[in-house]
Amino acid sequence: MEKQLTEYQQKVKQKFIDDRGPWKWSAMWDTILELDPAVVESYATYSSVPDKRGYLEMRMRKFIYIAIDSITGSLNTSGLKGHMKHALQLGVSTREILEVLEITSMIGSTTYELGVPELMDALQQRGISVAAAELNEHQKALKADYIQKHGGYWTNEKENILRLDPEYFESFTAFEETPWKSGVLTPKEKELVYIAVHAAPVSLNKKALRYHINCALDSGATANEIVEVFELVSTLGIHSITIGVPILKEALTELELC
């Protein structure tokens, strides 16, 4: 038997729908509303701030939500499907969504870019210097091509990856270029998605974040737009509640405690 909402719960539910849109409400939120209406109310207020300001177009906000809900480590299939459906209803194309997913998949490079420097330090402490050897002609060509395509950008991390495994460097660089070949999203839109991916708590990468912030600014993004990306990404924390509370309700039901 469905429980009747209290006056406060009804008020909170309507506020949530008014702030976030009717498409956002689901049975999951009914469960959270039942157990803790106060957190639903406070979340509706804080998470709707970017929507009310609207520095980013709605389609761009959908790109950000799709990206952060599809990141390995914070994958939220329920939220991802909801944002995809809403994006499609808004007129976003399948190709645009695919490109957002392709950009998000690049997060795998963080393991290599953060791990290789640690390996290099460990090797150096043992008297092994990978950097001492000259790059061969193929490695020099790969480096020159990368620098040319990325406006002069190069880091010690990429240098070390190139030295340790040029085949991997070449293949992953080609993989990274995939979203830039289709041209569906603008350079600015791509960079804002990259910022979201590298600013997510589970995949935070300060160097990559700084690089893509500069690229976004160069592509015409404003400070307000970038701040709004951060605000959207910060809502990732709610997954602890949206995923955890329904499981808590199941446990309570199975133990006949509610």
Model-identified regions with their sequence ranges:
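Extended, charge-rich C-terminal regions with high alpha-helical propensity
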Residues: 172-174, 193, 201-202, 206-207, ...
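Acidic, glycine/proline-rich low-complexity segments that act as flexible tails and inter-domain linkers
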Residues: 1-60, 89, 112-189, 214, ...
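Alpha-helical transmembrane segments and their immediate juxtamembrane flanks
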Residues: 133-136, 227, 231-233, 238
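Amphipathic, charged-and-aliphatic alpha-helical interface segments
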Residues: 61-76, 190-205
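Short amphipathic alpha-helical segments at helix boundaries and their inter-helical linkers
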Residues: 72-83, 104-119, 201-212, 233-249
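Membrane-interface alpha-helices at helix entry/exit sites of multi-pass transporters
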Residues: 96-101, 225-229
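Alpha-helix N-cap/helix-initiation sites
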Residues: 54-61, 77, 94, 183-187, ...
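A cross-kingdom feature marking solvent-exposed beta-strand/loop segments within repeated
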Residues: 81-96, 213, 217-219
